[in-house]
């Protein structure tokens, strides 16, 4: 962290966990195991120490938003419309965004017992591989220009206005948008939007994605740690693809392990690290909260915007 983060309050794990009364996590060990990414590490102690205080903070932000909407309604002399509370979750590839997002979905649905919580990943807004090939940017997949940002902005606008929306589905197994398959996103009390690009600006700069967020989280870690987690995940994906010729990773199961490791390392250097340093990490100070992970995946520091 640099002077760029002077407008954040740095909070240790010990201090952060003391900001919320001790309660039993509202999920079981089995449920937690089922939602974590297969190369991630998280425990019920992490839920108690980190995520329950975070859910409480989100509750405060939601209440503040509702109070402001009510006051605006009085000022405008009209009834305020209920809108979903939208949470953006960003961070590098392989840093644990998906685990954080799925856990928040469970915690919010059980903290607000009558609330509905939708979870969306921005992978569905990647252009299909064929489109990327036609545009000559398949090697830039994951970079800002490989996303249909106008479609993402349109989705956020419709969700913000309480509409149901069908969006494309992306498969990491086939490494592409799944034809004819859609995720139906219903009007909800909470919508969590997770992806590497959720704090980035569209190229036309007419409207910022972050304008739609009521709360935002950046999952952070050291570059060397993220690289290690990425390579570990890549190799584990191979083990899952050994008997699945339809998987993108199947072709790598036919290669010597040394060649596979060299390929994965090159992908990390040329794509994921470049994307992280140039486009993802520079947006982290747009988050309300930064969760910093140590080498063993444990969150050791929290940065809260002042």
Curated annotation (Swiss-Prot):
- Its name, as the record gives it, is Pantothenate kinase
Q: Which SUPFAM superfamilies match?
A: P-loop containing nucleoside triphosphate hydrolases
* Gene Ontology annotations of biological process type: coenzyme A biosynthetic process
The scientific name of the source species is Streptococcus pneumoniae (strain Hungary19A-6)
Which family does the similarity line name? Belongs to the prokaryotic pantothenate kinase family.
Recall the taxonomic lineage recorded for the source organism.
Bacteria, Bacillati, Bacillota, Bacilli, Lactobacillales
- Binding-site residues, ATP: 91-98
User: Which Gene3D superfamilies does this chain map to?
Assistant: P-loop containing nucleotide triphosphate hydrolases (3.40.50.300)
**Keyword Methyltransferase found:** no
